[in-house]
UniProtKB/Swiss-Prot annotation:
Belongs to the heat shock protein 70 family. Keywords: ATP-binding, Chaperone, Nucleotide-binding, Phosphoprotein, Stress response. Coiled coil: none annotated. HAMAP family: DnaK (MF_00332). PANTHER family: HEAT SHOCK PROTEIN 70KDA. This is Chaperone protein DnaK. It comes from Cutibacterium acnes.
Length: 617
């Protein structure tokens, strides 16, 4: 039976979980880790690397490595590699494919469905792009769930016996959300949410990078920011330093041979204290206050009414962040959840809810931003206010601005500003065929429908003629069905090609090991093997080694392996026959040894057993 999983598609790291026996369980990746770096790289040989292996090679492959692509979801951003152009949805799909593949290996069965989480403050276009990424990866996306809501579900599923007001403070690698929820009798209701889609751990890392660049430039007169490889090393060192400063009061950043000057190689060696780090990032910390205050105001609550605070996202491990949360909420955060895993666990629970495996649970989420259309004068006329529970549907009746207007352009926006120029455009469509009439007479009903994924559908109808037009708002970066289908096929083709490359690499490694083992056995038993058996084996080893020096000759390597295995089998038989002959020629020696043993001699005789079958493998 195909399985459904929960996926936290993160800016810095991603995580996948599944329900096992009714309990949410994190699935380790192929490398054995519980989270996977959200990094994708394209090698010069055409291979696509994802996760830790992509992260490790980033320094030497800067231009062909992508990280933090989540920050570009819903945008018209692209990355060119050789003769191909990749959109954020495709890069994210590579990450999702790896998570899917690792989950299938762990479960031993196909994974076809997923619940994928997004930041609560993601716009419609960003949600649509995330759904498309799942489709490209070969997943049926059952639901898009807000990360704080998923975290609250994982925290509170076994705590529904009493009413609770829970604050979720989610500071990830690239995004920040604050959500306030009521938990009661299995109902998880979001009261308000707010956030910043361009605030996260990456920004703290960048401050360390900027500081290191300044320190090095002041000392050596060289701008490391202009050197791509040096900058990549700085970014990795900054991330490590940030993590270390969460535990220690100071850390040393040492990067030997970071660049070269007129006198030779130059090294970077700096000491960074926690106090200095907090000073250089204090403005980032202050930006966390505004969404918190907005959520409390929108929910109409004060901090004394918060029962529990949940920290989500690796960046909440920074002491300054934890202290800020304690100051804002007036209480210590809950320590019982893993910030890196709780979102994926909650997503797997929601997958279980949708499959009917988890009973008596209802999630009531909200739309994070107001939705409306442009009216005369560029005014943003809101139809659905922010923090409205979804799914929902609202309608308003509008009219024409000019006499005898034959059509109206419905332009859809998302945001809180009074004028559309300051808000995010989600798309537009035209309602044509209006009957000639003075301005203000025609009646046009515009309906907004937000589904459970937070994706917007808009419908316009001329009340006089009955003519209507509708669209799913997808934003300028969204993909058409044909384009998604093409990308799905490309992704499948890439997955098959990568599988063949892995199999080829494994075969060549096996061939190298076979040559080594056979050569070692030959050297250790040279006196027991006749020349007419030894010579073909020696020649077969040499042939295999020479074949391994080539490239794109996998069939030749396989043939050379088979030849060596066959000849090694004859060698094994010769060794075994020699051992039997030696035993037959010296039976009295055995009796003497036995008698000696019986007379109290404790001499131990070591014997090596050569398994002929092993040599054939």
């Amino acid at each position: 039976m195909a399985r459904s999983v929960g996926i936290d598609l993160g800016t810095t790291n991603s995580c996948v979980a599944v329900l096992e026996g009714g309990e949410p369980t994190v699935i380790p990746n192929a490398e054995g880790a519980r989270t996977t770096p959200s990094v994708v790289a394209f090698t010069n040989s055409g291979e696509t690397l994802v996760g830790e292996v992509a992260k490790r090679q980033a320094v030497t492959n800067v231009d062909r490595t992508v990280r933090s692509v989540k920050r570009h979801m819903g945008e018209a951003w692209t990355m060119g590699v050789d003769d191909k152009t990749y959109k954020p949805q495709q890069i994210s799909a590579f990450i999702l494919q790896k998570l899917k593949r690792d989950a299938e290996a762990y479960l031993g069965e196909p994974v076809t469905n997923a619940v994928i989480t997004v930041p609560a403050y993601f716009s419609d276009a960003q949600r649509q792009a995330t759904k498309e990424a799942g489709e490209i990866a070969g997943l049926a996306v059952d639901r898009i769930v807000n990360e704080p809501t998923a975290a609250a579900l994982a925290y509170g599923l076994d705590k529904t016996d009493k009413d609770q007001t829970v604050l979720v403070f989610d500071l990830g690698g690239g995004t920040f959300d604050v959500s306030l929820l009521d938990i009661s009798d299995g109902v998880f209701e979001v009261k308000a949410t707010n956030g910043d889609n361009h605030l996260g751990g990456d920004d703290w890392d960048q401050r360390i990078v900027d500081w290191l660049v300044t320190q090095f430039k002041n000392a050596n007169g060289i701008d490391l920011a202009a050197d791509k490889m040096a900058k990549q090393r700085l970014q990795e060192a900054a991330e490590r330093a940030k993590i270390e400063l969460s535990q220690a009061s100071e850390t040393h950043i040492n990067l030997p041979y970071i660049t070269a000057g007129a006198a030779g190689p130059l090294h970077l060696d700096e000491k960074l204290t926690r106090a200095e780090f907090q000073r250089m990032t204090s403005d980032l910390l202050e930006r966390c206050r505004t969404p918190f205050n907005a959520v409390m105001k929108d929910a109409g609550l004060n901090v004394s009414q918060i029962d529990e605070v949940i920290l989500v996202g690796g960046s909440t491990r920074m002491p300054a962040v934890a202290e800020l949360v304690k100051e804002l909420a007036g209480k210590d955060p809950h320590k019982g959840v893993n910030p890196d895993e709780v979102v994926a666990l909650g997503a797997s629970l929601q997958a279980g809810v949708l499959k009917g495996e988890v009973k008596d649970v209802l999630l009531l989420d909200v739309t994070p931003l107001s939705l409306g259309i442009e009216t005369k004068g560029g005014v943003m006329t809101k139809i659905i206010e922010r923090n409205t529970t979804i799914p929902t549907k609202r309608s308003e009746v509008f009219t024409t601005a000019e006499d005898n207007q034959p059509s109206v352009m419905i332009q859809v926006f998302q945001g809180e500003r009074e004028f559309v120029r300051d808000n995010k455009s989600l798309g537009n469509f035209e309602l044509t065929g209006l009957m000639p009439a003075p301005r203000g007479i025609p009646q046009i009903e515009v309906s907004f429908d937000i589904d459970a994924n937070g994706i917007v559908h808009v419908h316009a109808k001329d009340m006089a003629t009955g003519k209507e037009q509708s669209m799913t708002v997808t934003g300028g970066s969204a993909l058409g069905k044909d384009e998604i289908d093409r990308m799905v096929k490309e992704a499948e083709a890439n997955a098959e090609a990568d599988k063949k490359r892995r199999e080829a690499v494994e075969m060549r490694n096996e061939a190298d090991a076979l040559a080594f083992r056979t050569e070692k056995l030959l050297d250790e038993n040279s006196d027991k093997i006749p020349e007419d058996t030894k010579t073909p084996v020696t020649e077969a080893i040499a042939t295999l080694k020479e074949t391994l020096k080539g490239t794109d000759n996998d069939d030749e390597v396989k043939a050379a392996m088979d030849d060596l295995n066959q000849k090694a089998s004859a060698m094994g038989q010769a060794i075994y026959a020699a051992a039997q002959q030696a035993q037959a020629e010296n039976p009295q020696g055995q009796d003497a040894e036995s008698a000696s043993s019986e007379s109290g001699d404790d001499t131990v005789v070591d014997a090596e057993i050569v398994d002929d079958e092993d040599e054939k493998k």
